[in-house]
């Protein structure tokens, strides 16, 4: 009965079902057991001093107050290579800006001093993990699994590439 206000606790012998009916029939203000309607206030969330910790606009922050890194231009050849490797179409100007912003954000990590910091292999480094012995087994279900695929080639699943349609129109 922890967390249920005292005045809502059932007397001995009452069932959980009757308790649920009692709670369902009470008003939300009565559930707290401390506030009444005269002291209850409506909160305007737009007038709070700190309404949200999440910024409403992008924040060009820096690490340790250093100047913002210079913008790294991405040439067309690099964009084409990234498109080919990632199978994602970066042809629009917005995608190009997003890529440059991501590179600028990630380049901030270069200014972090990591001398004397040991690499973290796992967050559970100090925990003893019991692992089972690895046994190689194909399970003899390859054909059953491949029957789930719409398209297979050389006993492999065929999936559409990224956000590029399979039937692509030639570029102008």
UniProtKB/Swiss-Prot annotation:
Disulfide bonds: none annotated. One of its GO terms (biological process) is glutaminyl-tRNAGln biosynthesis via transamidation. Residues 49-71 are annotated as: Disordered. SUPFAM superfamilies: Glu-tRNAGln amidotransferase C subunit. It holds the Pfam family GatC. GO terms for molecular function: ATP binding; glutaminyl-tRNA synthase (glutamine-hydrolyzing) activity. InterPro entries: Asp/Glu-ADT_sf_sub_c, GatC. It is found in: Mitochondrion. Residues 58-71 have a biased composition (Polar residues). Signal peptide: none annotated. It catalyses: L-glutamyl-tRNA(Gln) + L-glutamine + ATP + H2O = L-glutaminyl-tRNA(Gln) + L-glutamate + ADP + phosphate + H(+). One of its GO terms (cellular component) is mitochondrion. It comes from the Eukaryota. Keywords: ATP-binding, Ligase, Mitochondrion, Nucleotide-binding, Protein biosynthesis. Allows the formation of correctly charged Gln-tRNA(Gln) through the transamidation of misacylated Glu-tRNA(Gln) in the mitochondria. The reaction takes place in the presence of glutamine and ATP through an activated gamma-phospho-Glu-tRNA(Gln). This protein may be expected to contain an N-terminal transit peptide but none has been predicted. HAMAP family: GatC (MF_00122). Belongs to the GatC family. PANTHER family: GLUTAMYL-TRNA(GLN) AMIDOTRANSFERASE SUBUNIT C, MITOCHONDRIAL. Subunit of the heterotrimeric GatCAB amidotransferase (AdT) complex, composed of A, B and C subunits. This is Glutamyl-tRNA(Gln) amidotransferase subunit C-3, mitochondrial. It comes from Culex quinquefasciatus (Southern house mosquito). The lineage of its organism: Eukaryota, Metazoa, Ecdysozoa, Arthropoda, Hexapoda.
